[in-house]
A protein has these predicted regions:
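Conserved small/polar residues in nucleotide/adenosyl-binding loops
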Residues: 3-7, 171-178
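Polar-ligand-bearing catalytic/cofactor-coordination segments
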Residues: 58-111, 115-126, 137-147, 154, ...
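Membrane-water interface at transmembrane helix exits
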Residues: 27, 31-35, 51, 67, ...
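Juxtamembrane "helix exit" motif at the C-terminal ends of alpha-helical transmembrane segments
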Residues: 23-39, 119-132
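Divalent-cation-assisted or electrostatically stabilized phosphate/pyrophosphate-binding catalytic cores
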Residues: 147-169, 173
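Hydrophobic alpha-helical membrane-embedded segments
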Residues: 41-67
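N-terminal transmembrane signal-anchor/hairpin module of polytopic inner-membrane proteins
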Residues: 1-2, 6-33
């Protein structure tokens, strides 16, 4: 049992290191070829890549569906709408619970989908943005504290915590100043 746990943890480390590494290499390779062909082509491709990294519109659209459902259609429809953006059971949520779930999701996804990617793109361009998204996506997929992923996804979850630390501090500090 102990060996199995250790083996899962080691395999999780390998995955958590390889995925962002491969993502960075592929992204840098594509950009290097584009910039080699023509600097304008490189700039256009990198701009498109950076745009694709940011998750602004879908977050707004889905959260507004929750708002309109609460306002116009009632709690059952709002539960359905909020279930599309949260990873928890929404079947027993009241109006307050639905609102809280939506606000928490918007706040977290603003950090994960906008603030942190912008932070990494500011310093490392599209490569930094894609590497960040690879780490963040791994956490979303295997960073759970359940029997299946507890040991395998632990390193990916910690890695996500580390890469989000500075952007999150900047985001919360700026929000507190408002």
């Amino acid at each position: 049992r102990q060996m199995c746990i250790r083996d899962r943890y080691k395999r999780g480390i390998v995955l958590a290191v390889l995925i962002p590494l491969i993502t960075g290499i592929v992204t840098a390779g594509i950009l290097a070829v584009c910039y080699y062909i023509n600097i304008v082509l490189g700039c256009v491709v990198e701009t498109i890549m950076c745009y694709q990294i940011l998750a602004v519109k879908s977050l707004k659209t889905e959260s507004m569906k929750v708002y309109y459902a609460l306002k116009n259609e009632g709690v059952p429809q709002a539960r359905q709408a909020v279930s599309m953006i949260v990873g928890r059971d929404t079947s027993q949520l009241d109006e307050h619970g639905i609102t809280r779930a939506a606000v928490e999701t918007v706040a977290e996804n603003t950090s994960d989908g906008v603030v942190a990617p912008l932070f990494y793109m500011m310093f490392f361009g599209a490569v930094g943005g894609f590497v960040y998204k690879a780490v963040n996506t791994m956490d979303s997929m295997i960073g759970y504290k359940n029997d299946k992923y507890l040991h395998f996804g632990r390193f990916a979850a910690k890695m996500d915590d580390v890469v989000n630390l500075i952007p999150c501090l900047l985001y919360t500090s700026d929000a507190a100043d408002e």
